[in-house]
């Protein structure tokens, strides 16, 4: 059967044609909470909008702006706020769209800006509190992921500097300063006045309540069979030291007399003349576990100890985290600065003795003798010089039940 061109045209014309709907081009609103609340407007319609960023908990308008299509806007606040974002037609003032922060079931990426041991151990459990409150999926980046990934299998751990994808919100935990001025768009308040852990609670919008992390500990035996106490008399700054002359040796002798071995576990080597001079001489009658050994060995030493005695340093935070009874000696920082679950030994007469310069001054790490108020005077380091060994012994007796 043959067809002419005319017949084909007629056949085509007789076909019932389906009417396709016309495509309507509209602008699209996209919301995210990466380093703060953000509203993006995409689309071809030339139109102006009013965007409002509202703190729902305070019922407070934080930021309002006018936007066109193919622009984005955000307030500069990077810490958690329970945001509501509203978009209005500028011409009619009609509410066109809104979005309330809701992380349930979504990926939230939380990064730690610090590699310090204390910061990491203090801030990590707050992330767990955030997860439980918002029922979100946590992606986390720390400098010590190997301590935690087995303890928090429900989280995704990424290395520092690595990207995470398909995230709804991102928060960075840290102390953020610019020219010694707190950056209040990243930290809600001056962090030097707070417990270290509250830094994370504030940034993540949580009520502060001290909590401890779960941390992987080595499956190793006790370092010695006898009962023992760990000491860590060194720290990263001289101002952190316990400066009472002969104080550490007095404590060691007392513990030995009561039948306890004493393990010294600092990175600074026992027998090094310069380091020993900061302790009044080489400490005697200790088991030397100092030096560049793996941190896992120190964690194991602390975990099995009957007691840990240290300063405001990372090893004290490890002791707190692994739930070993802890005595923390410091006049350099105010008692609220570190953790509360310890015996905190502080300057005995704080009203008349200088103390807590850490909380009000900026440490000069290049000056080992830094003491902002009394350097080169007879009051140099008086904050810890005035802490007597008997005060420490009284705390030892309480923990070890020595009468």
Where are the language model's segments positioned?
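Catalytic machinery of carbohydrate-active enzymes
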Residues: 1-403
């Amino acid at each position: 059967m043959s067809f002419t061109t005319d017949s084909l045209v007629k056949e085509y014309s007789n076909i019932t044609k389906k009417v396709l709907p016309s495509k309507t081009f509209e602008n699209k609103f996209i919301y995210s909470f990466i380093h703060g609340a953000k509203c993006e407007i995409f689309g071809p319609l030339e139109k102006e909008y009013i965007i409002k960023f509202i703190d729902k908990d305070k019922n407070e308008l934080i930021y309002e702006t006018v936007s066109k299509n193919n622009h984005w806007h955000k307030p500069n606040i990077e810490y958690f706020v329970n945001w509501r974002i509203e978009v209005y037609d500028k011409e009619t003032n009609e509410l066109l769209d809104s979005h309330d922060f809701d992380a349930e079931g979504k990926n939230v990426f939380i990064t730690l800006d610090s590699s310090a041991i204390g910061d990491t151990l203090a801030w990590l459990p707050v992330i767990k509190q955030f997860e439980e409150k918002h029922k979100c999926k946590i992606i986390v980046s720390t400098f010590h992921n190997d301590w935690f990934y087995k303890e928090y299998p429900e989280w995704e751990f990424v290395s520092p500097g690595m990207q995470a994808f398909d995230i709804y919100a991102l928060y960075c935990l840290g102390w953020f300063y610019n020219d010694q001025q707190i950056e209040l768009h990243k930290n809600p308040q001056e962090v030097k006045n707070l417990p270290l852990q509250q830094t994370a609670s504030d940034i993540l919008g949580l009520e502060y309540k001290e909590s401890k992390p779960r941390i992987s500990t080595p499956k190793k035996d006790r370092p010695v069979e006898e009962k023992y106490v760990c000491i860590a008399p060194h720290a990263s700054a001289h101002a952190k030291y316990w400066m009472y002359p002969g104080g550490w040796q007095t404590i060691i002798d007392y513990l030995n007399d009561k039948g306890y071995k004493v393990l010294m576990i600092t990175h600074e080597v026992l027998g090094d003349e310069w380091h020993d001079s900061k302790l009044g001489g080489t400490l005697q009658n200790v088991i030397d576990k100092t030096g560049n050994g793996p941190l896992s060995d120190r964690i194991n030493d602390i975990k099995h100890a009957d007691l840990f005695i240290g300063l405001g340093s990372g090893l004290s935070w490890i002791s707190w985290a692994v739930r070993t009874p802890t005595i923390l000696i410091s006049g350099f920082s105010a008692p609220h600065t570190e953790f509360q679950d310890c015996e905190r030994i502080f300057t005995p007469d704080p009203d008349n003795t200088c103390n807590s310069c850490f909380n009000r001054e900026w440490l000069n790490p290049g000056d080992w003798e830094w003491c902002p108020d009394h350097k080169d005077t007879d009051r140099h380091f008086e904050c810890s010089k005035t802490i007597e060994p008997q005060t420490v012994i009284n705390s030892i007796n309480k923990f070890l039940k020595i009468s």
